Every structure is written in structure tokens, then in C-alpha cells.
């Protein structure tokens, strides 16, 4: 998921 991915974590 995005919240676990440093590349898009800022979207959470």
C-alpha cells in the first residue's frame, strides 16, 4: 500500500 511505500507515503 501507499502508506508502506516511501515513494508515496507523504500521500497518507
From Swiss-Prot:
Expressed by the venom duct. GO terms for molecular function: acetylcholine receptor inhibitor activity; ion channel regulator activity; toxin activity. Keywords: Acetylcholine receptor inhibiting toxin, Amidation, Disulfide bond, Ion channel impairing toxin, Neurotoxin, Postsynaptic neurotoxin, Secreted, Toxin. It comes from the Eukaryota. It is found in: Secreted. The modification Cysteine amide is found at residue 12. Its main location: secreted. One of its GO terms (cellular component) is extracellular region. Disulfide bonds join 2-8, 3-12. The cysteine framework is I (CC-C-C). Alpha4/3 pattern. Belongs to the conotoxin A superfamily. Alpha-conotoxins act on postsynaptic membranes, they bind to the nicotinic acetylcholine receptors (nAChR) and thus inhibit them. This is Alpha-conotoxin-like Reg1d. It comes from Conus regius.
